[in-house]
Amino acid sequence: MPQHSEAQARLVVDDEFRVGPVHDRVFGSFVEHLGRCVYTGIYEPDHPTADEHGFRKDVIDLVKELGATTIRYPGGNFVSGYRWEDGIGPKQERPRRLDLAWHSTETNEFGLPEMAEWLEATGIN
């Protein structure tokens, strides 16, 4: 049997050491169709603060405060079954599908065009 001995380790952190500048695009986030993130979160046409696109202005203001510079969409487990073709075209013609990741019905009311509009509203390029 191998013998184990205790080893000593030392970690030195130099907060003045810089490898290089960090690009602004590193500080991002993602939007996933989980729970209330999209529907009744960022998109709720009947909400008192909703704009002409159905985006909640109170949420837009909070997202701006975060300072995110990029958003990955769709994000999380939702992307595993996402069909981008379902989220384009007239909303009333978009198919409803079972979201296999979260076992819910995806209406595709919020798709790629809506995401692009929402990003513009938040100032995230």
Give names to the regions the model predicted.
Residues 1-125:
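Non-catalytic accessory regions flanking glycosidase/transglycosidase catalytic cores in CAZymes
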